[in-house]
Amino acid sequence: MAEALPKAGRYFCHSCTAEITPRLPEYTCPRCDSGFIEELPETSRNSENNSSNNSRTDQNRPSFENLESAQFTLPSGYGQVTFGIFNEGLDFPIFGTSGPVEETRDGESRREHQSRQRYGARQPRARLSTRRAAGRNEGVPTLEGIIQQLVNGIIAPTAMSNLGVGPWGVLHSNPMDYAWGANGLDTIITQLLNQFENTGPPPADNEKIQALPTIQITEEHVGSGLECPVCKEDYTVGECVRQLPCNHLFHNDCIIPWLEQHDTCPVCRKSLSGQNTATNPPGLSEMTFSSSSTSSSSSTSPTDENNSANNS
């Protein structure tokens, strides 16, 4: 009578770093034909039955090397999608009702993890499993659908409120505040610049603008190297310019549009009424220019100019 073959037990292949059922009677690994295997202790029959249905799919799962595990804390009532290596995972929310999280990892996974901890073997592959909250509502959008909507920039501020998790349950703020698409950053910068456009001093009074003296540029002005602070063009002899109470000179077309929006000098930020504490620029306060017969205001002091502007 032929001798019966020995019963195959549970073995761990150090070449494949996986739990195997050896090929008998050679006691070799059916995956790599290596004999570098070691018998593992027996476990309960229930664990063997629970792992039989899922053991075939483990070989078809993708392999990811050297993945660093991460854990994100999420509000209660969320399901979780776990991506990681065995007992360590990366969790993402799936919208659902509150309840205890149901563990779906099979018994073989726990045994393989214990074997790798025991023998110091490297992790051969990562697993992607889904842990759903108990009693998940049907028809609730999935994580993939929500991310796709956010990336496409088509989700509206009122859309997330219909998901039953409160507004902006995933993002930290309004999705419209994020930069979506190729031109998203440019749009945000433009919005920020528009917010600062109307800030600052109020427009100057039209009466004060019209009361600004007009003087004629002389050779003394040209010889001193004066230029319009706005357009940076040199003044020419005989050119008519407007003089502010701070003695700064500007082209009429350069200073009038500015004063219609801001009651300040573009150079020293002094208002037409002299309300701020800005001092006159050095040199101009002491300089006096001989003007033509059409205007004598250039030879007056800044105090006289302020008085004439207030009286007008």
Curated annotation (Swiss-Prot):
Signal peptide positions (record): none
First-tier enzyme category under EC: transferase
Q: Which SMART domains match?
A: RING
Zinc fingers (RING-type), renumbered ranges: 228-269
Task: Please give the residue ranges the record annotates as the region Disordered.
Answer: 40-62, 97-132, 276-312
Name the GO terms of the biological process aspect.
positive regulation of double-strand break repair via homologous recombination; protein K27-linked ubiquitination; protein K29-linked ubiquitination; protein ubiquitination; ubiquitin-dependent protein catabolic process
Q: Where are the zinc fingers (C4-type)?
A: 13-32
* Reactions catalysed, as given in the entry: S-ubiquitinyl-[E2 ubiquitin-conjugating enzyme]-L-cysteine + [acceptor protein]-L-lysine = [E2 ubiquitin-conjugating enzyme]-L-cysteine + N(6)-ubiquitinyl-[acceptor protein]-L-lysine
Where along this sequence does the record place binding of Zn(2+)? C13, C16, C29, C32
Q: Name one GO molecular function term.
A: ubiquitin protein ligase activity
For bias type Low complexity, the affected ranges are 43-57, 290-301
Name used for this protein in its record:
E3 ubiquitin-protein ligase RNF126-A
